[in-house]
From Swiss-Prot:
It is a single-pass type I membrane protein. It comes from Arabidopsis thaliana. Keywords: Glycoprotein, Membrane, Repeat, Signal, Transmembrane, Transmembrane helix. The lineage of its organism: Eukaryota, Viridiplantae, Streptophyta, Embryophyta, Tracheophyta. The keyword Kinase does not apply. This is Cysteine-rich repeat secretory protein 57. The keyword Transferase does not apply. Residues 1-20 form the signal peptide.
């Protein structure tokens, strides 16, 4: 009987920790930009009320779609806003990400008339200017692995450029798909490593501007991080990422306690798993 009670407690612990891991992975904050040049608004004004309404609506709508845009107010009190979740995340993850983003953008850009916030799974933006169909690549943010591509990955730079160029062209044909402009491709090279390529544009861009946005984002990403295991750039209108970190040819994972490294997204899962395993044996007295 005592053992059964202990197992029940451990199961509750496991599911709680697993939920925390999932939320942590999906809600990784990348950057927040509060645009000072657009001016400020005063609290308790009509613009402030319209902004609060817009952010609340975006948060609610993220339960039903991976993309949504909205305009509230009239004249100088008009606020335009949108959110975009990465095409492969589910609605639960999208909603959690957008909910956090709307809270944080309001908290960190308290009186700014324009701001944008990026997470790994989503972005949220608002402005007093209409921006939906405009091509923009700034402000952007990128993250990358701390570990370089192994020397055995022959001609990686050229292969990355060629493959991403192909994926960008294919994605421009997906303007009317269920998830517009989103495309993920996995290609194996030399039976040695897999290259996962992901691109996505804001649905309001036309195919030409989507292609241009992705090419400019790729150019910036390869210049900064083209020799890393993985890299990811998020711009106001598109995103580009590549990943080889799941390749079977890579050496064993480094110790999870290594701080300050983003080499492998998900190291925390390994650490939590180890802690949970130790807890099980200790709790049961094994």
């Amino acid at each position: 009987m005592e053992t059964t009670k202990k197992l029940s407690v451990l199961l509750c612990l496991f599911f709680t920790m697993n939920q925390a891991i999932s939320e942590s992975d999906s809600d990784e904050h990348m950057a927040t930009f509060c645009n000072d040049s657009s001016g400020n608004f005063t609290r308790n004004t009509t613009y402030n009320t319209n902004l609060n309404t817009l952010l609340s609506t975006l948060s609610n709508q993220s339960s039903f779609a991976n993309y949504y845009n909205l305009t509230t107010g009239l004249g100088s009190d008009t606020v335009h806003g949108m959110f975009l979740c990465i095409g492969d995340v589910n609605r639960t993850t999208c909603n959690a990400c957008v909910k956090n983003a709307t809270i944080e953008i309001a908290k960190n850009c308290t009186n700014h008339r324009e701001a944008i916030i990026y997470y790994f799974s989503c972005m949220v933006r608002y402005s007093d200017k209409f921006f939906l169909s405009t091509l923009e690549t700034k402000p952007n943010t990128y993250w990358s692995s701390d570990d370089p591509i192994p020397k055995s990955y022959d001609k990686f730079g050229q292969r990355l450029s060629d493959k991403m160029g192909e994926v960008i062209i294919r994605s421009s044909l997906l303007s009317s798909s269920f998830t517009p402009y989103y495309l993920m491709d996995t290609t194996t090279f030399d039976n040695l490593y897999d290259l996962e390529s992901v691109v996505q544009c804001s649905p309001h861009l036309d195919p030409k501007n989507c292609t241009t946005c992705l090419k400019l984002a790729l150019q910036e990403l390869t210049q900064c991080c083209g020799d890393q295991l993985w890299a990811f750039i998020f711009t106001p209108k598109c995103l580009v990422s590549f990943d080889t970190s799941n390749s079977s040819s890579l050496p064993p994972l480094p110790p999870p306690s290594r701080s300050g490294s983003f080499s492998i997204r998900g190291n925390n899962k390994i650490l939590v798993g180890m802690i949970l395993a130790v807890s099980v044996f200790a709790f049961l007295g094994l």
